[in-house]
Structure formats: C-alpha cells, structure tokens
Regions:
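Beta-propeller fold detector
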Residues: 25-32, 37, 81-91, 155-170, ...
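Glycine-centered hinge/linker elements that transmit conformational signals in sensory
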Residues: 502, 537-576, 603-617
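Conserved N-terminal structural module of periplasmic/extracytoplasmic solute-binding proteins
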Residues: 22-31, 41-53, 61-65, 78, ...
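Surface-exposed loop and turn segments in beta-propeller and other repeat-based domains
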Residues: 37-40, 85-118, 158-182, 275-278
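Extracytoplasmic/periplasmic substrate-recognition and gating elements
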Residues: 603-700
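C-terminal capping/gating helix-and-loop segments adjacent to ligand/active sites or protein-protein/ligand interfaces
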Residues: 687-786
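Extracytoplasmic/periplasmic solute-binding protein
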Residues: 461-467, 472, 496-548, 584-590
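Hinge/lid segment of periplasmic solute-binding proteins
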Residues: 412-471, 610-615
C-alpha cells in the first residue's frame, strides 16, 4: 500500500508542471509601492514591452521601473517562473536622439541608486527573432544587432546599419499652410524573414513595410495607402492586410480587407482572401511554426486559424488585447503589467458568447476569466445595423455561434418601427430569458429605482439587467454666472423665458458680455432654440403619454416666443473678428451636457456647473428624459445558464459607483476622488516646509513666507471644496430628490430615424418653410407613420 501511494505521488509530481503550465501567471505588477522603501527592497516593478518566440521558448522584454532599464526574461514549457537573462539596456522612445537619450540616462543616474550608464549604441527600440536568435533595432543610429546568452551574460553582435532612417518617419501636409511636417513614426511590428528584417511603420493612412537587408542595411519598401497590417508567416513570408475601398476611420472599422501572402525574397504577392471583416484582423497575434497556423486575439479570446476565415476558439486570457507568442505547447500573453501562460490544448472547454453594441465591463470580464479558466469568452461587437429586434432575434436563434448574452446600448437613434427600443420588442416577442431565477439578479433588480426596474420587468419576471444609464441636459456655468453678476433666479427655467432672456442679451448686453455667449456658440440661435423646442416637445408628449402632434397650444406658444426672439446683434458679434477675445467664448447655459451618469463636475455646493431643470413653458410640468441605458439580455435558448448566472453575478459585484448611484434607489455612499488625498498630502507637506522655513528665517523674510503660506492655504481650501468628490453627498441628494422625480426613460420615438422629418427641420433652418408650414407638414408625416 505504501509503495502504491508513493507511485501515485510521484505521478502527480511529474504531472504538476504540465498542469500548472495550462494556467500560469508568470508576473503581475504589484500595487501601490511605498516611495519610502529603498529601491533594493521594493518588489520588482516591470513595464512589459513585448514578447517574442526565441531560444526554444519565449523572451519577454520589460522595463525594470525601479532601475529604469530594459531586461530580458526567458520562459519555456515546463518552467513555472521566468528566468532573467540580463538587462541594463536603454529603452529608446520614438522621439529619442542620442542627446536626449544621454540626458535621460544622466537623470536616472542622479535619481536611481546603483544606476549604471547603458551602452547607448546598443539601445533597444524593438525586439524580434527568427524563431531562435534575438534581433534588436536601435532607431537612434539605425543599428540592428543580435543578442545572445553566454556564460558571461548577454552579449551583443552587430549585424548591419540601416542605410537611412527617414523611412522610419511619418509625414503629413498641413492643408492650411501647405507645409509638410515629419516626425518619428510608431514601429508596430518587426519580423525576421531569412536575411531581411521587416518593420511595420505607422503612416497617416495605414502602414508601410520597410524591408532591411541584414547583409548590408539596404532598404526597400512595401507601400500603398491601403496597406493596414503585416503578420509573420512561414518560410520567410509575410501576410499583408489591405483595406478594400477608401481609407478613413469609418471604413477601417466597418470595411472589409484582402489578405495576401508576400514573399520577401522574390517580392511576389499572392492573394489569399477577399472581403475579410475587420474583426478578423488584429495587431496582437502570432504565427505558430509548430502547427502552421496563426493564433489571433479577439479581445480576451484567442482563436486559431489557417485561412483567417474559419476560426477555432482556443483559450481566454484574463486581460484584454494581450500580445502573444507561442511555444510548442503554450501561448504566452503579455500586457503592460502582466505575463500569462495558457496551454494550447485545454481539452473540452465551454464557450460563453457575448455580443455587445457598446463595449464591455473590463473588470467583470477579467475577474470572470480568472475565476473560470475553463471557459472561453467569445466576444463580438454588434454593428449599428444589427441593433434592431429582428436582427437580434435572428442571432439568438442561429444554430451556430448564437450569443448567450447580449449587451445592448439603448440610445435615442436606434428605434424600432413604433419608436420603441429593441429591448421592448424582444421582451414582447419572448426573446429574453427570465432572470429572476438568479438570486443576485433578483436582489439587484429589487433595489433599482422604479423607472429602471419597470423598464425590464413584466408580470414579476425580469427580462434584462440594467447596468448603466446616462443622459444629457441643461446646465448653468457657475463661473460665467458669477462673472456676469447674475443669480440663479436670473436664469430662465423654461423655453419661453429662454427666448426672452436671449432677446434681452441681444438688445442690451451684447457689448458688455462680448467675451461670453448665452448658449453654446452657434451660427444661428434661432436654429438652436428651434431644435431644442422640437426635441423637448417630443419628449414631453412621451412623458405625458399624449399623442405626438405639433398642432398643440403648448407647441404653438413656444413657436410664438421663438418668432419674437431677436438674435441679430449676438450673431453679428459672433461673425466679427475681435483680437481681444479668444476664439473660444464661455457660455452661460449648456443645453446638451451630460447630467446623469457623470457627477464629477456638478451638484456639490461648489461645483462648476448647476443642473438646470428646463420646462417648455411656465405653465407645464418639467420632465427630464433619460435616453441612454445599457442592459444585459440573456438568450432564452442558452445552454450555459449556470455560467450566465455566474457572469451576471460578477457584473453586479464589479459595478462602478457612478452606475450604482444612477440605478440603485438605496445608494448613499459618497466617493472621494482617488487623487484627492494625494493632492491634500502634497499641499500639507508644502505648508509644513514653509512653516519650518518661517521659523528659521530672519525677520525681514517672515512676511514674504507668510504670504506664500496664505496662498497655499487658500489654494488647499479651494481644492478641498471643489475637487474632493467623484460623487459628492449633495450629488446623491440632487439626483434622488430633484432629477429622478421628474425623470422618464425616453424612447427614440417614431421620428428618430425619419429622413423626411429631418428634411422638414432643415427646411425651417434654411427659411424655406414657415413655422406654420412645419406644424402642418410634420403632423401629416406623423399620421402617415402611424398608419
């Protein structure tokens, strides 16, 4: 029996390194380090720069922040921690020259104990390998050199010097002055292809690929405005991605790409695929020579592909968008602060699919991935065209790749045919799983403010999980109000009075208030106020649950006020060039600033902005429309209900305070700014030093020091009252007692996506139709849409 136990124990020990290698964290940057701790006693603080396959494993390049120099670390399958190969290299920034590098080193020498001046000839900008040997580039002098490990430490061997360095720059032409400006470009990737070093160089549009002959430093380029990315491939070849169509940011994210194989030796380019979507390409992947496949990064998920069309989910990393390198058995992923290892083959893993219209909670996903390493998180971004109930239902009913969870950003510009949100239709059609089966969700939803709870519940069932809400509104600039000598009671609180206020400003105050504007600067105040009236009238009808028609006494009263409003002097002043006034003029009233969801700049006693409830007329109820909400919806056909429950619980646990403050009725926890205590401590240290100097100063100096003390104390007082809170106690009070009671969840409405209605508004702007004609034509349009 004893012998059998020993055999079992031995087998477990033999298997342990392999089991550990499936899920290793080789390094995580420590948290806040006490500045008083000597450098030699501090934990290693690394800023991870890159990872590359080399020397039978991988080499991690990292900056040791304690000693301000680059070090190289090695890991291979079977190891449980990285081994330091050596260090002392200088890390070249893109804008560095030999002079700035020398100055930086001299500064480090004065600050860092035991700092040794590095060899700036062999400084490192980027590091790569041919799979075994490390190659480094120093962009300051164009030197390319090898780095190898010997019994005496790391040794460098010069390979060649680039014949010119201008190819590593980016140039752009200023359209106003026609001048051409040149500055150092970012070098995104490097690969060794036989006797050539390929460098991906960022350009104004896409990239160019610089090919450096390692025998003599000669340079040639693969150019083209459509070239967007370069990957390593087999047998000295590169994979090139080219954008199909025009080059602009919109087409880059929504357009399609061609994929071709480029032979560095012959210059021949072979087309492999066309019409490849943006989501199929990233800048973080790695070629796997052991299997002839490519591992690519999809947020946290790693996929394996050979044709960049079909993908196989492999594993999930805790962090998003890691850069990876592969060994025979493992994938090593790095970001700025961590180094992770995951096995290529993790057996039967569950795939939890999340499709999102507006990003995801990084904290919740990271914690979920750490706690559930057997789960692959497959994340996909929903395009705007997919944000309708029919498309979402089709996705959830798909036989393959159907999402388990939808993260939907509900906004004013994503209406259904009846003007509702897609969520409303999904709930009506039975495409939302009842989440009341999850205790954490049930408890959370029971604590929601009523308007959010009512939006996701029907007959005691919970069909979505609200995780954030935000909206915009009217604000008074406290600073401008005080500079103008006004009181809050002087500011209009309805659109009728706003027209009269603008007229008074126009007739009497344009000269005196030349450095300020009543509203955000606009070429036409009449257009701006008309748009506000239309927007707020549509919202009022929705809040009051009355049919939307513009032929209504309240709307006509607003149109009469608009017709009487005078803005000629204001708009004339806007067009005048006055060298004494800056191009940007401060405004008194913001009409579209974020009110709900961002509480940092207002609502405390000394905030820079004052929330301004704005009614339509003096005689109607004031409403505030909250038009943006993010919810999680669960596919009723999911086969991963238990994992979904874990994910929802994680999202609730990691919810940020600003979201809780908006959503939860029982939220009462003020949040201090994370930087506040540090700043107060700095002020107090300064005051302590000034008082010490004052005690020891001669009499004639004491008064001057006292004046400085008074200035610092006043500055500390201002900082304390204005900058202390991220969420101030008065913010919570204002939101719960003033904003919420007048709030409603504003749906897009049937006019939200109407080109015909937008054309009518434009005709009013251009003076092509009268306000009376607008009322008549808009109501005809609404009647037609309602049929």
């Amino acid at each position: 029996m004893r012998a059998r136990r020993l055999i079992i124990l031995l087998m477990m020990l033999l298997l342990l390194p392999q089991a550990q290698a499936e899920r290793l964290t080789l390094y995580t940057r420590p948290g806040q380090v006490d500045e008083a701790t000597p450098f030699q006693l501090r934990p290693t603080e690394l800023s991870i720069c890159s990872v590359t396959r080399a020397m039978g494993g991988v080499v991690v390049l990292a900056n040791d922040d304690n000693y301000d120099s680059l070090s190289l670390y090695f890991w291979q399958d079977g190891m449980t921690e990285m081994r330091k190969l050596g260090g002392g290299f200088y890390w070249v920034m893109s804008s560095d020259t030999m002079e700035t590098a020398q100055e930086s080193c001299e500064y480090s020498m004065s600050r860092v104990p035991n700092y040794r001046m590095p060899d700036l000839t062999h400084a490192i900008s980027n590091l790569t390998s041919d799979g075994e040997t490390l190659y480094a580039l120093n962009r300051i002098n164009g030197l390319i050199f090898k780095i190898s490990e010997t019994k005496d430490g790391l040794q460098t061997e010069d390979v060649c010097t680039m014949e010119n360095l201008s190819c590593l720059n980016i140039s752009y032409r200023d359209l106003e002055t026609d001048k051409v400006y040149t500055y150092p470009a970012s070098l995104t990737r490097m690969h060794v292809c036989g006797s050539v070093l390929a460098i991906s160089v960022m350009q104004e549009n896409g990239i160019k690929v610089v090919l450096v002959d390692l025998t003599d430093g000669a340079i040639r380029e693969i150019a083209g405005e459509s070239l967007e990315a370069m990957y390593e491939w087999a047998d000295g070849e590169l994979l090139l991605w080219r954008l199909e169509g025009s080059t602009n940011e919109i087409s880059r994210s929504s357009g399609t790409y061609t994929l071709s194989r480029y032979s560095v030796a012959t210059g021949e380019e072979t087309l492999l695929s066309t019409g490849v979507p943006y989501k199929k390409r990233s800048e973080c992947g790695a070629y796997d020579p052991y299997s002839g496949s490519y591992y690519d990064v999809r947020t946290r998920q790693i996929v394996r592909t050979t044709d960049f069309v079909q993908e196989e989910p492999v594993v999930t990393f805790p962090a998003a968008n890691v850069n990876i390198a592969v060994t025979k058995d493992s994938i090593v992923g790095v970001n700025l602060s961590s180094v992770y290892v995951r096995s290529k083959e993790n057996g039967d893993m569950t795939v939890l699919r999340i499709q999102s219209s507006n990003g995801a909670s990084n904290t919740a996903l990271q914690h979920f991935a750490e706690e559930n390493p057997e789960v692959i998180l497959a994340q996909e971004t929903l395009t705007k065209s997919a944000m309708n109930a029919a498309s979402l239902a089709a996705r959830m009913s798909a036989s393959a790749d159907a999402p388990d969870i939808l993260r939907l950003g509900l906004t004013p510009d994503m209406p259904e045919a009846d003007g509702s949100w897609p969520l409303d239709v999904l709930m009506d059609k039975g495409w939302c799983m009842d989440l009341s089966v999850y205790p954490e969700v049930l408890d959370y939803v029971s604590r929601l403010n009523g308007i959010y709870r009512d939006a996701v519940t029907r007959d005691g069932k919970i069909y979505a999980l609200p995780i954030y809400a935000w909206s915009y509104g009217y604000f008074i600039s406290r600073n401008v109000m005080e500079k103008l000598g006004l009181q809050e009671s002087d500011i209009p609180t309805n659109l009728i009075d706003l027209c009269a206020f603008i007229t008074k400003w126009n007739d009497n105050l344009t000269g005196a208030y030349a450095a300020y504007t009543p509203l955000e600067e606009t070429e036409s105040y009449r257009e701006r106020v008309f748009d506000l009236m239309v927007r707020d009238w549509i919202g009022y009808c929705q809040a009051e649950n009355i049919p939307l028609r513009f032929d209504h006494p309240v709307f006509r009263e607003m149109m009469a006020a608009l017709d009487a409003m005078r803005t000629d002097k204001i708009e004339q002043a806007n067009q005048q060039v006055n060298e004494e006034i800056s191009d940007y003029r401060e405004c008194l009233i913001w009409t579209d600033a974020q009110a709900v969801g961002n509480f940092a700049n207002y609502a405390d006693a000394f905030g820079s902005r004052i929330f301004l409830p704005m009614a339509l007329t003096p005689d109607v109820t004031t409403h505030y429309g909250i038009g943006y909400m993010t919810v999680l919806v669960v596919n009723p056909r999911t086969t991963n209900a238990d994992l979904v429950g874990k994910m929802l619980a994680q999202v609730i646990a990691d919810q940020e305070a600003t979201a809780k403050c908006v959503l939860l009725a029982d939220y009462d926890e003020p949040i201090e700014d994370s930087y506040y205590l540090t700043m107060v401590s700095d002020y107090e240290k300064t005051l302590m030093e000034l008082r010490r100097q004052q005690e020891n100063a001669p009499a004639w100096k004491k008064q001057g020091i006292q004046e400085r003390i008074n200035e610092e104390e006043a500055s500390l007082q201002r900082y304390t009252v204005r900058e202390r809170w991220t969420i101030a106690p008065k913010t919570i009070e204002l939101y719960q007692q003033t904003i919420l009671p007048m709030s409603y969840l504003r749906r897009p409405g049937i006019l939200a996506d109407s080109d015909a209605f937008n054309a009518l508004v434009s005709q009013v702007h251009q003076g092509e139709i009268s306000l009376e004609e607008f009322v008549e034509e808009a109501d005809k349009l609404i009647e037609g849409l309602e049929q």
